Amino acid sequence: MARIAGVNIPNHQHIWVGLQAIYGIGATRAKVICSAAGIEISTKVKDLTDAEMEKLRDEIAKFTIEGDLRREVTMNIKRLMDLGCYRGFRHRRGLPCRGQRTRTNARTRKGPRKPIAGKK
């Protein structure tokens, strides 16, 4: 297994698919990285040379990925909550903040239903 940015990339996959195991790299960015490094996207991870791996590492180092990206996203949400804006308020309450309805649905964000004590 190749190790890039602290993540193990599976050997049997094409390089552009394997790069998507890194947090912050999706399909489009993986293809851009491969083309910038001069590597064919259909190349398997196990067939890469050490020089190609170094080129990939150099290209990936240009982007914010993994822990730094997670920290940045967390800090952005925390900033919204500290501002007291609508989106921060919705994050604080654990509700959807992009305009979805909440009278029904939104169960993923709200969590499981809480039973209300009934009359006997």
UniProtKB/Swiss-Prot annotation:
<keyword id="KW-0699">rRNA-binding</keyword>
<dbReference type="InterPro" id="IPR019980">
    <property type="entry name" value="Ribosomal_uS13_bac-type"/>
</dbReference>
<keyword id="KW-0694">RNA-binding</keyword>
<keyword id="KW-0687">Ribonucleoprotein</keyword>
<comment type="subunit">
    <text>Part of the 30S ribosomal subunit. Forms a loose heterodimer with protein S19. Forms two bridges to the 50S subunit in the 70S ribosome.</text>
</comment>
<dbReference type="InterPro" id="IPR018269">
    <property type="entry name" value="Ribosomal_uS13_CS"/>
</dbReference>
<dbReference type="InterPro" id="IPR001892">
    <property type="entry name" value="Ribosomal_uS13"/>
</dbReference>
<comment type="function">
    <text>Located at the top of the head of the 30S subunit, it contacts several helices of the 16S rRNA. In the 70S ribosome it contacts the 23S rRNA (bridge B1a) and protein L5 of the 50S subunit (bridge B1b), connecting the 2 subunits; these bridges are implicated in subunit movement. Contacts the tRNAs in the A and P-sites.</text>
</comment>
<dbReference type="GO" id="GO:0000049">
    <property type="term" value="F:tRNA binding"/>
</dbReference>
<keyword id="KW-0689">Ribosomal protein</keyword>
<dbReference type="Pfam" id="PF00416">
    <property type="entry name" value="Ribosomal_S13"/>
</dbReference>
<dbReference type="GO" id="GO:0003735">
    <property type="term" value="F:structural constituent of ribosome"/>
</dbReference>
<dbReference type="GO" id="GO:0006412">
    <property type="term" value="P:translation"/>
</dbReference>
<dbReference type="InterPro" id="IPR027437">
    <property type="entry name" value="Rbsml_uS13_C"/>
</dbReference>
<comment type="similarity">
    <text>Belongs to the universal ribosomal protein uS13 family.</text>
</comment>
<feature type="region of interest" description="Disordered">
    <location>
        <begin position="92"/>
        <end position="120"/>
    </location>
</feature>
<dbReference type="GO" id="GO:0015935">
    <property type="term" value="C:small ribosomal subunit"/>
</dbReference>
<dbReference type="InterPro" id="IPR010979">
    <property type="entry name" value="Ribosomal_uS13-like_H2TH"/>
</dbReference>
<dbReference type="GO" id="GO:0019843">
    <property type="term" value="F:rRNA binding"/>
</dbReference>
<dbReference type="GO" id="GO:0005829">
    <property type="term" value="C:cytosol"/>
</dbReference>
<keyword id="KW-0820">tRNA-binding</keyword>
<protein>
    <recommendedName>
        <fullName>Small ribosomal subunit protein uS13</fullName>
    </recommendedName>
</protein>
